[in-house]
Design a protein with these regions (language model features):
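Ankyrin-repeat boundary/"N-cap" motif
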Residues: 2-8, 33-55, 81-99, 125-131, ...
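Conserved ankyrin/ankyrin-like repeat signature
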Residues: 19, 66-67, 107-111, 143-144, ...
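Ankyrin-repeat and related helical/solenoid repeat scaffolds used for protein-protein interactions
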Residues: 143-146, 150, 156-207
Length: 228
């Protein structure tokens, strides 16, 4: 199983749909098989794949929409979360590197929509109690945040440290190209998306601090108050 699985994963990274179809036709069990080792992908898809993940996790991380559909049709589980971090394909699809050369926000949103249509639970929490909304917010994926809020993700859900995704939105998370012009613009769009969704800036985290309390930037505080 391991060699065919590695070949399938290589085809996914290369976005080679013909080869993906070939390997799934030869061995349908590959659609649900777990990977055996932790691997960092850095070439076409930038993401860790952990022991217990499936091919669908990698396809989701790379926004390989057509391959995601192929894997789902072959029986892949949209809610599979057998890695030690308990992350599902939807968590991986919500991650992003907005300053990276392969960044594609439209394909990211379509991949998220495809997984949700296949039954992925929108607010499933990983080992850190993070939802897909937390992860999209943390990595400054503005279009993904807007879409997840639009289709009903709960902005009040807290992660393991007690933070909601809205709290993360007003802080520098160290991800998503923090400090770049792209990241600053994405952060403003994300905050606007939370406000438009009806999320309350007075929302408290696990330490009793509101979203406004967590906002250190005067510009962000203006956005939250409606003056920006």
């Amino acid at each position: 199983m391991q060699i065919p699985m590695l070949r399938l994963l290589a085809a996914i990274e290369d976005d080679d749909r013909r080869q993906v179809k070939k390997w799934l036709k030869a061995n349908a069990a590959l659609a649900t098989a777990p990977v055996a080792h932790d691997t960092l992908y850095e070439r076409e898809i930038v993401h860790w794949l952990y022991k217990g993940d499936t091919a669908l996790h990698l396809a989701a991380a790379g926004y390989r929409l057509e391959i995601v559909r192929l894997l789902l049709a072959a029986g892949a589980n949209a809610n599979s979360a057998q890695n030690r971090r308990r992350s599902g394909p939807l968590h991986y699809a919500a991650d992003g590197f907005i300053t990276g050369p392969a960044w594609d926000e439209k394909r990211q949103v379509k991949t998220i929509a495809c997984l949700l249509d296949a039954g992925a639970a929108i607010d499933t929490q990983d080992a850190n109690a993070a939802t897909a909304l937390h992860r999209a917010t943390r990595t400054q994926c503005a279009a993904a945040v807007e879409y997840l809020l639009h289709v009903g993700s709960d902005p009040t859900t807290r992660n393991k440290t007690g933070a909601t995704a809205f709290h993360l939105a007003v802080q520098h998370t160290g991800r998503g190209g923090t400090g770049t012009d792209e990241a600053k613009m994405a952060q403003q769009h994300i905050i606007a998306a939370f406000i438009s969704s009806g999320a309350n800036p007075a929302l408290k985290d696990g330490k009793g601090l509101s979203v406004i309390d967590r906002a250190k930037s005067a510009c962000i505080r203006e956005l939250l108050s409606g003056d920006g």
